Amino acid sequence: MRNLYIIVLAIFTLVSCDDDTNLPAPYYSIEGKWIWSPSDNRADANTMYEFVDGIRYTYYCITCPGDEAYWNSLETSDAIPGTNPYKFENDTLRVDLHFGNELVTLITFECDGGKLFMDGQFSHLWRLSSDCQ
């Protein structure tokens, strides 16, 4: 009889378990190299932004359109003079453009973090290391 109670209790316990795990939404970082294209085609990219430790560096293509090897070959010493401090918190990007100007935009990631959309700004950037189109 005692074994029956243990079995019933075990069954009741196992059946009453509910998987209520709330998985957090994926977190994507803004850190890294991102290319911008004036068209919807990433192959037309002529500008790259690199976000590193709160500083945004800007690079322009010399022989456009630049391919992945070209963009990957650039180092911070190749960036245009002047940098922009930035903060990325709660899906909001704030870039200090200096002289009292600031870019504040909501960021939405797609393609497993390989593409980002800016709310009302230059629209989209592609992460350099992604295969997103």
Model-assigned labels for residue ranges:
Residues D19-I35, C132-Q133:
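N-terminal helix-cap/turn-to-beta initiation motif at the start of protein domains
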Residues D18, I35, V52, W126:
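Residue-level detector of conserved, well-ordered beta-strand and adjacent loop positions
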Residues T13-S16:
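C-terminal motif of bacterial Sec signal peptides marking the signal peptidase cleavage site
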Residues R2-V8:
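Sec-dependent signal peptide recognition
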Residues F122-Q133:
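Short, low-complexity, Pro/Ser/Thr/Gly-rich segments in the mature regions of secreted, periplasmic
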Residues D40-A43, T58-F122:
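Contiguous, well-ordered beta-strand patches that form the walls/edges
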Residues N46-D53:
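Broad, structure-driven detector of short, well-ordered beta-strand segments within folded domains
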